[in-house]
A protein has these predicted regions:
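N-terminal hydrophobic targeting/anchoring segments and the immediately downstream early-domain regions
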Residues: 1-145
Length: 145
């Protein structure tokens, strides 16, 4: 049997973990480390999308709290998952049998025009931002707007 590498370009698991106070290792969401073990070598973009979260807090605050929660989950599961910022880091993680994790923001309302939060996101490992989800924000709008 051929063992293929899996690279999933998107999941909303980080925000849901925070909202539901669930662990990354074992949860009822789309991605759990325990279930993903059977994949063998894999990489995952973990996306933070605040657009659809009921806004009891400002979107940047939701993002910051979810990012902190997910960072704690990554540290707690460091034997199974590695935060990657480059292709070479991903290759090293997968060669060691760990998930190569990349962070993404889906919809710029998570950072708005807050350069400080954008810098913090980059420092914490965010390497991809899609400017819009399905709603207009202060930086961009979807084509149907």
């Amino acid at each position: 049997m051929t063992n293929y590498r899996v690279f999933d370009g998107h999941c909303d698991t980080p925000i849901e973990l925070w909202l539901q106070n669930q662990p990354l290792l074992e949860n009822t969401l789309a991605v759990s480390l325990a279930r993903a073990q059977r994949l063998g070598t894999w990489a995952q973009f973990f996306a933070f999308c605040t657009a659809w979260v009921e806004a009891k807090l400002p979107r940047p605050e939701i993002f910051a709290r979810a990012l902190d929660y997910f960072d704690a989950q990554l540290r707690e599961n460091a034997d199974k998952i590695t935060l990657c910022r480059t292709a070479s880091e991903a290759e090293a993680a997968m060669q060691s049998g760990k998930c190569a994790a990349f962070l993404a923001i889906e919809g710029a309302e998570a950072v708005r025009e807050d350069e400080g939060l954008l810098e913090r996101a980059y420092e914490m490992g965010v390497r991809m931002i899609s400017l819009v989800w399905n709603l207009p924000n202060s930086l961009a709008a979807p084509c149907g707007s």
